Amino acid sequence: ELAIAYQITDPPLIHNVKVNNGSKPRGLCWHWAEDLEKRLLAEGFATLDMHRAIANGNSRILLDHSTAIISAAGAQMEAGLVLDPWRQGGELFWSPVMSDPRYDWEPREEVLRRNGRVRYVQAGMEG
């Protein structure tokens, strides 16, 4: 549903350019993570917790990348599963967090605070 809503027709980085120039409505990695998190939370799963994470948050060269992670209720993010529909242009990639072959994930709040983007942390805490 999100791939249709985002009008995905290209690989992720090309789609990002189109979102950033206004020719596509949404579809940046953080859009996918935010919308996926909202949909999963709306399901009200009592046995799962949602986490948000960012990779490459310290890199000046690589783009940072956001995702949603699910874990057993009460478990740490690192024990969860990465749910990343951005990576393959709308096809869901999933992997245990610690086995992700491409990204090393950190809790979103930690990365945002460290990088001085506190307003995003506060907005996430309110919503």
Label the model's feature ranges.
Residues 1-18:
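Secondary-structure boundary elements
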Residues 14, 30, 53, 68, ...:
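Sparse, context-dependent recognition of short Cys/His-centered cofactor- or disulfide-binding micro-motifs
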Residues 17-52, 56-62:
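Mid-length scaffold segments of soluble, non-membrane domains
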Residues 75-127:
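A recognition module on extended beta-rich or small alphabeta surfaces enriched in W/G with H and D/E
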Residues 34-35, 62, 66, 119-122, ...:
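Cysteine-nucleophile amide-bond enzymes
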Residues 45-92:
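Hydrophobic/aromatic-rich core segments of domains that either
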